[in-house]
Amino acid sequence: MASPGTRPGASPGTERGSARESSGLQSSGSAGLFAVEAVELVGPAASAALDGVECPDALREALAGLLLVVEAERAWDMRAAGVDAAVVLGAAGAGAAEALDAAEAAGVLRLTGGRVRVLDPGPAHTVYATVPPARGRAAHRLLAAAHTGGPQALPVLFHRASAATAPAPRLGDALAAAAALPGGGPTHAERSAAWARSAELAVDEGLRAVRLIHAADQARLAGLPHRARELLAQAGCEGPHDAVRGSAQLVSGQLALQDGPVADAREALLLAAESLASTDPHRALAARLAAVEASWAMGDAAACREALDLTPARPEPDRRLAAYRAGMSAVMHGRLDTGRQPLREVVAGAGAAGILDSPEVLLRAGGAALVVGDLPAACRANSRALAVARARGPNILIAQALERLAYGELRAGRHARARAHAEDGLRTALGAGQDNLAAHHHAILALVASVEGSSEAVAEHAAAAERVAAPHGLAQAATLAQWARARADLAGGRLAEAAARLGPLVGAGPRRGHFAVRMLAVPCFVEAATGTGQAEAARSATAEFAHWAAQGADPQAPAQLARCRALLSGPEEREALFTTALARHDEVTGDFERGRTQLLYGAWLRRRRRPGEARGRLRDALVSFERGGALGWAAQARAELRATGDAGPCEPDGPLAVLTPQQLRIARCVAEGATNREVALRLSVSPRTVDHHLRNVFAALGVRSRVELSRWVDRAEKTTAHP
């Protein structure tokens, strides 16, 4: 059987043989130089670093040399998935292939797909750190020679620069020029390493600072925020030059936007825009747009308006960008009707240009589509942004594109897709040090879990979002997390808890939720408030919701508004309003929201003693919830069906079969720990009715306490689930 690093059908060593051939070791000339110099690269100190590595004594020196060369190559990009086998084997010289065999056997390295991957970074790092500086520089010289003639000049220049022993301004200039070249090829991590090394070779302090700022920005784009901050600190950007100071402030603000307090990010970005306005209007505009993003995340509408309304030093050459700023400014000033047309131009422009647009342009189009309520266009633009970021970079935008896409799918009612993209985005954000985006992904996952019925997942993801949202001032993530908790309460019939969570978010005052989210939570609040005797608060929230819904900001809003009005109306009007709500649901997609309306309508019909009609609505609700994976809500629909006398497939057998449907509902609520008053609120009956039924439950089952009832129900339900 072939080893893990070999091609199917190839014998062990074939892959290494091809690597040696491609590195030129089979020819004369430079191969001899590599072999002689590589033997001299390491000494006793470096070999001692291998004490914990199982390796034949005859190969220890060669293995140390190989690890030194591998680590020197990794200095070029520590995030890369391995290093080029042909390059490192060629640089390591004689004995390298046998040393690689030993390293694989010891679990230190692995050769696969023409790349040498580091499995245990400790030995290689220790060797690189303990060899004398001259030997480290020699390793870089060998790597520069091995890269010569390759497709890129940057690695050759980087290793030559790393082998330099004194300030070498010309070499530093060449390295910086290569790092600045646009287009594909070097990764952001590689460009960062090149800029940082070119800074070390600079004589002028101002030039050194500029290059370190470039290195920091490339480290940020590579998903290395800690390295980026180290480089910024080395730059020491308190000099008199606006351009240098503004560049440092821009990178600092963008870093804080990724994983720091967003209020700090906003201030740094506004300072950057001011400093760069006269010398670099393009980057000044980027700073202003990032300040808008920070203000949005912190839920500060006034700060959004301020950043949007800043007058650029020069007219914006991009018409779509000007339309975006004009449209968003109108929206933030409360004029969605005015802002809709320019924002639609932004969306249409992205659709026309398609895949040729940058991820940033597509993300703006996706955001504009969300604001005007065009959810299909939002999902298309954000999906395209994700594809472009993955294909062409920058990789730092992948987690953001996934977050925007997941949120759009959540709004569109495609919860399974939203979960898949948010899970991917969470992994990506955490891997890139983007804690703020990770918090948003956690909040989205909490909302999805509140639909799918996992209260544990809701609590876990909401808590994770809030742990970052609180210190970093992420009002949007915090509002989404609180909404998810409240919706889980609703799914579990805990109306009072849901109303208590949502009341501050949808109302006025300092605890008001994020301006772009709070209206979305109003239908949940109205459902909870009307079920707990808070009709006036529900009416006030519904009046504001009606004004918002009339602007067309969300396709589900008309149906939700009719549902809210039905819950607040008298018996004469309620049926007509529920019917109107269902008609509005028919005009848009979204099984979950339609199912909620059917559930509330069916429950009301049951309480009006119209069980036959109620069953039809409740069965429709059950189908909608099951189709959308809303398991907790499906359980509510089944419970309501049982209360109508419907003998569904989930009817209990065994001891609980002696209970009536209403007694069974009360027994289950009590088993969950609900008080009589809480049960009454859930089932829309009086506490006296609950008390009456509960006495009969105790008598029928022969139990004498609520604790005993809870154990009885738990055993019976487990027996039914697992016969």
Where are these regions (language model features)?
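Short secondary-structure boundary elements
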Residues: 1-8, 12, 16, 25, ...
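Internal alpha-solenoid helical repeat scaffolds
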Residues: 2, 189-192, 200-440, 448, ...
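Alpha-solenoid helical repeat architecture
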Residues: 57, 73, 111-115, 151-155, ...
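Extended alpha-helical scaffolding segments used for macromolecular assembly and cargo binding
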Residues: 117-118, 134-227, 231, 245-247, ...
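Alpha-helical repeat scaffolds
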Residues: 174-178, 226-235, 263-272, 301-315, ...
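Helix-turn-helix DNA-binding segment
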Residues: 642, 649-723
